[in-house]
């Protein structure tokens, strides 16, 4: 999708986050304190990224997940911006900036914390997976 089409499709915040590597404000975003059962997909492409089963309250101010639904759905990139070194997380197909992954997550779940911008995500409630075209992902909740 071309940049001009994306600007029309996305909110200004979602565009800034996904296309310009922006970061939304902590603690005031849509999914930080949101724990309904369902699937989180890339707001640009709709590619499945995370499930609510892997979401946890990290206290960082952004949605946190212990792992992506499939490692192939995200790609990691070294990020040296803001005078620090981090690992950026991007969606594989649309190349949307999602957030960063850190090694301070729950040890019993692998030790990773995927700190993801709400503005980069669209939530599909569990009871709408089939009607929204994500029926293949119901099995993850069994």
UniProtKB/Swiss-Prot annotation:
Catalytic reaction equation(s): L-methionyl-[protein] + [thioredoxin]-disulfide + H2O = L-methionyl-(R)-S-oxide-[protein] + [thioredoxin]-dithiol
PROSITE patterns membership: MSRB
Note the Pfam families from the entry. SelR
InterPro entries per record: Met_Sox_Rdtase_MsrB, Met_Sox_Rdtase_MsrB_dom, Mss4-like_sf
Residues of the MsrB domain: 3-126
Q: Which UniProt keywords apply?
A: Oxidoreductase
Q: Which GO terms describe its biological process?
A: protein repair; response to oxidative stress
What is the E.C. number? 1.8.4.12
Metal-binding as a keyword?
Answer: no
Alphabetized HAMAP family for the sequence: MsrB (MF_01400)
Q: What's the protein here called?
A: Peptide methionine sulfoxide reductase MsrB
Gene behind the chain: msrB
């Amino acid at each position: 999708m071309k940049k001009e089409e994306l600007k029309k499709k996305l909110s200004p915040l979602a565009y800034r986050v996904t296309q310009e590597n922006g970061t939304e404000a902590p603690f005031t975003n849509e999914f930080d304190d949101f724990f309904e059962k369902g699937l989180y997909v890339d707001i640009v492409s709709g590619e499945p990224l995370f499930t609510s089963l892997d979401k946890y309250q990290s206290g960082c101010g952004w949605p946190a997940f212990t792992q992506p639904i499939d490692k192939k759905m995200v790609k990691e990139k070294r990020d040296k911006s803001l005078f620090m070194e981090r690992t950026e997380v991007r969606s594989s197909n649309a190349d949307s900036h999602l957030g960063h992954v850190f090694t301070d997550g729950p040890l019993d779940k692998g030790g990773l914390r995927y700190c993801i911008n709400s503005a980069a995500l669209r939530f599909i409630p569990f009871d709408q997976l089939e009607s929204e075209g994500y029926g293949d992902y119901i099995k993850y909740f069994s």
